[in-house]
Curated annotation (Swiss-Prot):
Keywords assigned: Fatty acid biosynthesis, Fatty acid metabolism, Iron, Lipid biosynthesis, Lipid metabolism, Membrane, Metal-binding, Oxidoreductase, Transmembrane, Transmembrane helix
Protein name: Acyl-CoA 5-desaturase AL21
Gene: AL21
List of residues binding Fe cation 1: 87, 92, 124, 128, 259
The record's note on its domains: The histidine box domains are involved in binding the catalytic metal ions.
Originating species: Anemone leveillei
Cofactor names: Fe(2+)
């Protein structure tokens, strides 16, 4: 099954990655390491690099208490923080929460150490606006490793190509999110101090480094792998794919072609067999009366986005809209 015809693909050869539905040609971004690095890039490389180095101590600091702490924080910060709060609630407004609960989950997300809510939401909205083009903050056509991690260390690229936080005005209007943006580093230190106080160095290694690095790469695999390897179920006009393995790692985020087809949907695992842990949590919150205005795709929208509504024209599938 080929991808829809679009301006981007007219520039790309139709070679496919192994075990992938996605035709794409890399245009590897030449990252200039010898350059003037701004404070954001320096902070990112110190934080990400430092946490990876700390992980080397994991075998020597193992304890069951540290292990279970790591697993618990990974699940809580990943599901309630990154995927439920940052992604589906704040970025896409897929459902509504009482303000106190929205703020609480956003603070939980802060401790996944993937950035403050304003930065995360702004970057992800630019990703959807410019998906798989040269303006995409972590475009796969700039090379696998750029889309996976190196984009984090080139904030000038995002500023020049996309802009700053103009697309996150709904968050910037709220003093709470401006506060988290200004004080993000403080919360990183606070987390480290509390973990050390309660469990010493092993809690730092397992409760902060191991579970955070695991969370980093799980999220980054959505950016890199899920725009290269997997299956396309919907005519999204981009390179997004569904990848069941990444979905298992990320509480449902790996159903990425579904997500790009229905960005507003709180449910990413559209089919009954597509496990989506984050969606189950949202449904529980809805049952408890805490989540309202929960959005899911209509049957009409599904038919519109289906490849069955396309007319096959040689190598391309053109929307009949």
């Amino acid at each position: 099954m080929e991808l829809p015809a679009m301006a981007l693909q007219s520039e790309l050869k139709q070679d496919k990655f192994p075990s992938s539905d996605v035709p794409v040609k890399d245009k590897t971004k030449k990252i200039t390491w010898v350059r003037v690095w701004n404070s954001t890039d320096i902070f990112h490389i110190i934080l990400v690099g430092g946490l990876h180095v700390l992980c080397l101590s994991a075998p020597f600091t193992f304890s069951w208490s540290a292990f279970w702490l790591s697993l618990t924080l990974y699940a809580v910060c990943g599901v309630f923080g990154t995927t439920l709060s940052y992604h589906r609630n704040l970025t896409h407004r897929s459902f509504k929460l009482p303000k106190y609960l929205e703020y609480f989950f956003a603070y939980v997300g802060l401790h996944a150490l993937q950035g403050d809510p304003v930065w995360w939401v702004s970057t992800h909205r630019y990703h959807h606006k410019f998906t798989d083009t040269y303006l995409d903050p972590h475009s796969p056509i700039e090379g696998f490793w750029f889309s996976h991690i190196f984009w984090l260390f080139d904030s000038k690229y995002i500023l020049e190509e996309c802009g700053r936080y103009e697309n996150a005005g709904d968050l910037l209007k709220q003093s709470y999110y401006r506060f988290l943006e200004r004080t993000f580093v403080f919360h990183v230190y606070l987390q480290a101090a509390l973990l050390y106080m309660f469990g010493g160095f092993p809690f730092i290694v397992w409760g902060m480094a191991v579970r955070t690095v695991w969370g980093f790469h799980a999220s980054w695999l959505v950016n890199s792998v899920c725009h290269r390897y997997g299956h396309q179920a919907w005519d999204t006009g981009d390179l997004s794919t569904n990848n069941w393995f990444i979905a298992m790692l990320t509480s449902g985020e790996g159903w990425h072609n579904n997500h790009h087809a229905f960005e507003y949907s709180a449910r990413h695992g559209i089919e009954w067999w597509q496990i989506d842990t984050t969606w189950y949590v949202i449904k529980l919150l809805e049952y408890l009366g805490l989540a309202t205005d929960v959005k899911v795709p209509s049957e009409v929208h599904k038919r519109k986005m289906s490849f069955k509504n396309c007319v096959q024209d040689k190598q391309f599938c053109v929307n009949d809209k």
